[in-house]
Amino acid sequence: MIDRLASGHFEVRAEIDGVPLMVMIDTGATTTVLSFEDARRAGYEPETLRFEIPIMTANGQASAARVVADEIRIGDIVRRRVPMMVAQSGRLERTLLGMNFIGTLSGFDMRGERLVLRD
């Protein structure tokens, strides 16, 4: 179970390619998008990526680059070969866990101030 933050969002510890990161669950995001800083932490060398894909973020329009996670893990839930994007530096404060991951689950439920992910 994931508790709702005071901000109203749900954030959870995920491991992306074995690197622990805090991600915000975003059912409005089509794709999982790494912040530039989290991409660096996860070993994607964002300075070498080509930011050619236009995306909309809470901060407005930005460009992103495509990458693929070998593995994303949230607790016992594991998905492999997950397509993701990396946002340009300074354009995304928090990595977003999008519907390309959430949609692979058998479901998710809101229970009061908690979110439950079901594999």
Q: Where would I find each of the regions flagged by the language model?
A:
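Pepsin/retropepsin-fold aspartyl endopeptidases
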Residues: 1-22, 27-119
